[in-house]
């Protein structure tokens, strides 16, 4: 992994969270630590205060519940992914992507995860065109109003059992668009995700590792 890659942050135990929070464009800092579901990995905090925080090249950023994305000061790694798909899906897992109002960076990285360098299909993971052929929906983008209905219809078209994966900071929290008038995230109040892959955009290796993990392949 490129040493310059901004992966899992190393937040010192003595970090001034209020000071770091004053720099953050997405309000990722709180009294609990740094929320990787909000962080866009811009690196401003690390550039301004390298004595408090730095980003390591560790690309294992995904977790299986939203609250696990909050890293406390002094915490060195994220909890391991414990969720596992049923055995019937551990050798073949089909994903339908819905791009819901994002910038297309996460979509490009998701597509790159299937190229010759990362080859996600070697683990039996396929990205399919029809929701009727899918086992899961992988959501990218903050969910704008114009895509809310299409997202819901796509989800309804996926046969049971089905799973929801949130890929990228925008999908997880709304990212830089959180709270905007054009955003409608009501869908996520009704359906729970089994996997959260942060990043702006999410790196192909983070995507591959995360999905392979819930298949019991990593």
Residue ranges and their predicted role:
Residues 46-131:
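Flanking helices and flexible, charged tails adjoining ferredoxin-like Fe-S electron-transfer domains
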Residues 11, 18-63:
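Iron-sulfur cluster-binding cysteine motifs and their immediate structural context
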Residues 27, 33, 160, 182-183, ...:
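Ferredoxin-type iron-sulfur electron-transfer modules in oxidoreductases and energy-metabolism complexes
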Residues 108-110, 115-118, 124-209:
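Cofactor-cradling patches in redox/metallo enzymes
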Residues 1, 14, 56-58, 98-100, ...:
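Fold-independent oxyanion-binding glycine-rich loops
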Residues 1-10:
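Flexible, acidic/Gly-rich N-terminal and inter-domain linker regions that tether
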Residues 210-218:
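C-terminal alpha-helix
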Residues 16-20, 102-103:
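Cysteine-cluster motifs in flexible loop/terminal segments that predominantly coordinate metals
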């Amino acid at each position: 992994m490129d040493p310059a890659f901004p992966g899992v942050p190393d937040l010192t135990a003595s970090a001034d969270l209020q000071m770091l929070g004053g720099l953050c464009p997405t309000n990722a800092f709180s009294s609990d630590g740094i929320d990787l579901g909000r962080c866009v990995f811009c690196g401003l905090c690390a550039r301004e205060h390298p004595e408090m925080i730095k980003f390591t090249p560790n690309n294992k950023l995904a977790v299986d519940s939203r609250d696990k994305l909050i890293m406390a000061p002094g915490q060195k790694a994220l909890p391991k992914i414990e969720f596992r798909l049923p055995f019937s899906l551990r050798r073949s897992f089909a994903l339908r992507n819905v791009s819901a109002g994002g910038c297309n960076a996460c979509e490009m990285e998701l597509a790159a995860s299937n190229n010759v360098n990362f080859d996600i299909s070697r683990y039996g993971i396929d990205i399919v065109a029809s929701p009727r052929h899918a086992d899961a929906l992988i959501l990218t983008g903050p969910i704008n109003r114009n895509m809310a209905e299409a997202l819901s219809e796509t989800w309804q078209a996926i046969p049971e059992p089905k799973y929801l994966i949130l890929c990228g900071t925008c999908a997880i929290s709304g990212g830089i668009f959180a709270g905007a008038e054009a955003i409608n995230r009501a869908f996520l109040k009704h359906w729970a995700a089994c996997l959260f892959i942060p990043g702006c955009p999410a790196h192909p290796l983070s995507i591959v590792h995360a999905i392979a993990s819930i298949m019991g392949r990593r």
